[in-house]
Structures are given as C-alpha cells and as structure tokens.
A protein has these predicted regions:
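C-terminal or internal capping secondary-structure element at the end of a domain, subdomain, or sheet
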Residues: 119-159
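Short acidic, Pro/Gly- and aromatic-enriched capping/linker segments at domain boundaries
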Residues: 31-38
Length: 159
C-alpha cells in the first residue's frame, strides 16, 4: 500500500471510529442529558427519523463527529475532517463517512463503500450546523442486508 493510500485509509478509519464512539456513547442513560447538545433529524429509507433519546457531538483537531439515537434505538452518525464550512463528499479519497445502526445491524458509507455528502454551513469551537445525506452499505458480520438511504438530514449541535 502506498503512502497516499495508507493516509486515506487512516483518515477514513479515524472518522469511522469517531462516529462509532459517538453512536455508542450517545445511548448512555447514566450520563448527562445529551439532548441539550442540539437537534438532528433525517429520513431513513423514506421514513422520518429524529434523535429523541441522545445526541453526541465532538469537534477536536478539525475532526467532527455527530451521532443521534431515537427512542427505538436506531442511530445515525457521521464524521468528517472539517476546518471550515463546506461540502464534504463521502468517497475513496475523502475522510468523511456515515453510519446507521438498527438493533445491532450496521450500515456504513465510507471509502469505497456507499456514497453521500456532509454540508457544514457553520462551525466553531462551540457548535456546528448543516445537512447530510448518504447511502450506506451493510457491514459484514452484523446481519445487515440491503442499503440504507439517509436523506434530508439536518443538524444543529453544540459541543
């Protein structure tokens, strides 16, 4: 693997790890009221979804990770390397990714798997807002099948 390919893989893996951690930490019922972190909603396969149980958001060293969970335990998250507002494409050469988790089954858009965009309209040391949409492929070994299509995603979060 060449140096450029290794760097792309490392950035994508780091972003995916941030999203996974945010999704996992977002459902901690013993922690603070993370709904104070803002709002997040989207459509998953055409059905409305809203983070009603937990929202976790982090921004450190220009890496943004945001995830939310609804009352049924369905989680949506995404991450990207962000230093300023803009649109970030989920693709092989991009350190951006998206994730859906339902009942332990996982779908991911990262690198060569899936596609989509994350648009950051505002970002600061205290919060971020924007939109997201992606098509996520099933993660092997989780029991997930078919793709998950996330559209009309909107977020407004604080860190």
């Amino acid at each position: 693997m060449g140096v450029a390919a290794w760097r792309r893989a490392a950035r994508t893996s780091a972003g995916a790890m941030i999203v996974a951690l945010a999704v996992g930490c977002g459902s901690d019922s013993t922690g603070p009221d993370v709904l104070d972190n803002g709002s997040m909603s989207a459509k998953i396969d055409g059905a409305s979804w809203s983070a009603t149980t937990a929202i976790a958001a982090t921004y450190n060293s220009n890496i943004l990770g945001i995830a939310g969970t609804d009352a049924a335990g369905r989680s949506v998250g995404f991450g990207a390397a962000v230093s300023a507002p803009g649109t970030f494409t989920i693709a092989v050469t991009s350190p951006a990714n998206g994730l859906v988790n339902e009942a332990g089954k996982a779908w991911q858009a990262a690198g060569a798997v899936g596609s989509g965009t994350i648009t950051i309209t505002a970002i600061s040391a205290t919060g971020a807002k924007g939109t997201f949409q992606f098509t996520a492929a099933p993660v092997a070994g989780t029991g997930a099948t078919g793709n998950k299509v996330v559209t009309e995603g909107v977020f407004d979060v604080t860190f």
